[in-house]
């Protein structure tokens, strides 16, 4: 949200996260999408928190990949406008608005159109994204229905898949929703 309490909680998490990552020797950070919640009304205070925390992450890690989730996008069905463009020039920050596939790693933003059809051919060992997969719980009670698009089975040739989007931590086959 846009509240000071929410932003303070998120900032406290960033401090904790950096401390934990450093204790485990992590050099790269991959944020799995939806940094902002309100795609049409992110206020100036929230934007200031965003800049300070992205600068903090950029100093703590060699590379920070910020995946564009559906809430970071102005339109749900295209990625042409996002709420994170203003952090693009912070050192070590990489906004993921297009697919990145390098060697054993794929980093994929919110999928639009029929992009999901490319996933079945992928063989990457690690896939990071912001996926809306059926049969996972959207919250504690409600399961995502199958709407005829991307499915967990499409990742069968991949190793481990880590995704944002649903807020409940859960796992099915090789796909893990990290939750929040």
Provide a role label for each language-model segment.
Residues 30, 65, 96, 106, ...:
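Hydrophobic/aromatic beta-strand patches that form the interior of the parallel beta-sheet core
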Residues 2-100, 154-158:
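Core catalytic region of metal-dependent phosphoesterases/phosphodiesterases
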Residues 99-153:
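Binuclear metal-dependent hydrolase catalytic cores centered on His/Asp/Glu-rich metal-binding motifs
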Residues 44-47, 79-83, 120-121, 140-144, ...:
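Short, glycine/charged-enriched secondary-structure capping and boundary segments
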Residues 14-16, 22, 113-115, 120, ...:
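A structural signal for the main folded, soluble domain(s) of proteins
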Residues 33-34, 69-70, 130, 164-165, ...:
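Active-site glycine-centered loops adjacent to acidic/histidine catalytic or metal-binding residues
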Residues 133, 139-180:
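Conserved beta-sheet core of the metallophosphoesterase superfamily
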Residues 36, 72, 111-113, 132-134, ...:
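Short, solvent-exposed loop/turn segments at secondary-structure junctions
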């Amino acid at each position: 949200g846009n509240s000071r309490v929410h932003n303070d909680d998120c900032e406290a998490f960033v401090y904790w996260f950096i401390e934990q990552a450093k204790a485990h020797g992590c050099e790269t950070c991959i944020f799995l999408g939806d940094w902002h919640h309100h795609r049409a009304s992110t206020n100036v205070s929230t934007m200031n928190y965003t800049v300070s925390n992205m600068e903090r992450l950029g100093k703590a890690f060699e590379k920070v990949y910020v995946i564009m989730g559906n809430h970071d996008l102005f339109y749900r069905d295209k990625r042409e406008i996002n709420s994170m463009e203003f952090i693009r020039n912070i050192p070590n920050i990489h906004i993921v608005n297009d697919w990145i596939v390098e060697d054993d790693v794929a980093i994929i933003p919110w999928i639009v159109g029929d992009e999901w059809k490319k996933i079945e051919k992928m063989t990457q060992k690690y896939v990071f994204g912001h996926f809306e997969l059926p049969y996972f719980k959207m919250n504690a009670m409600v399961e995502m229905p199958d709407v005829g698009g991307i499915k967990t089975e499409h990742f069968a040739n991949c190793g481990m898949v880590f995704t944002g989007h649903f807020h409940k931590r859960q796992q099915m086959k090789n796909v893990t929703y990290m939750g929040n």
